[in-house]
Amino acid sequence: MAIAYNSTNRTEHAYIDHPERMRLIEEYFGFTGIVVEILEKRKGQYARKGLTSAGIVVVRCLNEDKMITAYMPDEEQAKEICRKAGKKQVPPKLWKKIQKNLERHPELLYMVS
């Protein structure tokens, strides 16, 4: 199931601090369903960090369905999320998607969160 993000369920950080990255992610990949998700402590608070079926990382508030940020992971970031989720490896279809994303849109790697 795709994730719908609009002005009511996204934080200022996502669309005010990083508008170009968010626009490109929406344009190139969209916000698809979460395949692997972990809890992670960010800036003293826990958040949900998920890898989507499009190969994008979406970070969401723990207690609300609000997006904090999204970014295109490199291979190590994807592996780390899967390891923390208890998986031995990134699911093969997702791994191929991430590698294609990196080949097609390497500029997004430099738009960090």
Language model: regions and residue ranges:
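Ribonuclease/tRNase effector modules and their secretory precursors
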Residues: 1-113
